[in-house]
Design a protein with these regions (language model features):
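Alpha-carbonic anhydrase
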Residues: 1-234
């Protein structure tokens, strides 16, 4: 099956989400996976309690930014930060964002959703989603006193990915797919329940092309189970 990285796709018109599967065989194969993402997440009687812990082992490291697949990606230079789930390490490979949020929690769509893409030694993906409200006077993402910095001119950033995360990491967990072509699965999805605050100035350098809507519509649940892990404050 030819993986054609040159197939153009987007979020409206002939190349929009409804037509992704018809753009090439690779996308068509991915769309056959029945458990697609994103989905509507709710805490209800049918939500199962998550028994396995997702643990974060992030550290300050160097990233570069790249423009591809209809958004900006922050890509780490080295394999340093990772998460652990069921005794398996998944290293952080990519950070990108979607406007507005792709997942919806309890009926509410947020302004922006960051995706933290991880991969284990078997090339299996685990993605963590974090939602934000865009704010005017608050919600800074980096701490200069900590030696963290963003430099879009040099395409070099020093940051601990943990700054993107809420202190309290209660989250949903389900099996889904990539939300961009080829939308293949299975992928372990974890979506933080706590919504953060992000200063809208974060988006200023990306104004124009990358501050446009790039969210895939909600997909059917198709009978899958949703788990919830509640983290109690220490």
């Amino acid at each position: 099956l030819k993986k054609n990285m040159d197939v153009e796709w987007g979020y409206s018109g002939d190349k929009g989400p409804e037509n992704w599967a018809s753009l090439c065989d690779w996308f068509a194969r991915g769309a056959e996976f029945p458990l697609q993402s994103p989905i509507h997440l709710t805490k209800g009687e049918e939500t199962k309690i998550e028994g396995d812990t997702l643990s974060f082992h992030y550290q300050k490291q160097r990233f570069t930014d790249k423009e591809f697949k209809n958004t900006i990606h922050l890509v780490p230079f080295d394999q340093l930060s990772y998460v652990e789930f069921k005794k398996e390490r998944y290293y952080l490979t990519d950070i990108h964002f979607h406007l507005p949020s792709e997942h919806i929690i309890n009926g509410k769509q947020e302004d922006i959703e960051f995706h933290f893409v991880h991969m284990n030694s078997k090339k299996e993906n685990l993605v963590v989603g974090v939602m934000y409200q865009l704010m005017v006077q608050e919600g800074w993402l980096y701490n200069q006193e900590n030696g963290e910095s963003w430099n879009l001119e040099k395409h070099e950033h020093w940051v601990n990915p943990d700054v993107f995360f809420p202190e309290q990491k209660s989250h949903f967990h389900y099996i889904g797919s990539l939300t961009t072509p080829p939308t293949s699965g299975p992928i372990q999805w974890f979506v933080m329940d706590h919504v953060g605050k992000l200063n809208q100035e974060f988006l200023l350098p990306f104004d124009g092309q990358y501050a446009r809507p790039n969210n895939r519509p909600i997909q059917p649940l198709n009978g899958r189970e949703i788990y919830y892990f509640e983290e109690f404050e220490q």
